[in-house]
């Protein structure tokens, strides 16, 4: 399939915490869609190895959440480095979207971009500098159309691929019920 500069790349990461100066990436996934949000391709879900000391330094919320999902065990078993994961994602995305064309798409993606800047800078540069952040519409709907905001129920599984599909569904919800097209 030829690369198309109008496609959108959705990304989600799970991290050991929120501070890229102290925390690390443990899972990353991507999905490519057409501008109308139909899925073109689902990328690999990559679990990145981190040391026991990094995992043990997680706060209780992260230990509980990533422990219940099984992610901590997957991280310990993984041999994939951040650099290897970064290259696999760039190789995958390059098949569908030219570098520098897609905004980074997802929910609260400034956080993902901060971690990419710190640990996957080549992947960060693959994206356009613009963002398509579904959380912007969520915050506007919460203030301007509370019924629309409340009518989308998030599962918040904190699994990278599931969270991407939930973000796409949430944007479809706002497109249908909030935006006047």
Curated annotation (Swiss-Prot):
It is found in: Cytoplasm. Its EC number is 3.1.15.-. The keyword Nuclease applies. GO terms for cellular component: cytoplasm. The active site is at residue 129. It comes from the Bacteria. GO terms for biological process: DNA metabolic process. The keyword Signal does not apply. GO terms for molecular function: 3'-5'-RNA exonuclease activity; nucleic acid binding. It is an enzyme of class 3 (hydrolase). Keywords: Cytoplasm, Exonuclease, Hydrolase, Nuclease. Belongs to the oligoribonuclease family. HAMAP family: Oligoribonuclease. 3'-to-5' exoribonuclease specific for small oligoribonucleotides. This is Oligoribonuclease. It comes from Bordetella avium (strain 197N). The lineage of its organism: Bacteria, Pseudomonadati, Pseudomonadota, Betaproteobacteria, Burkholderiales. The gene is orn.
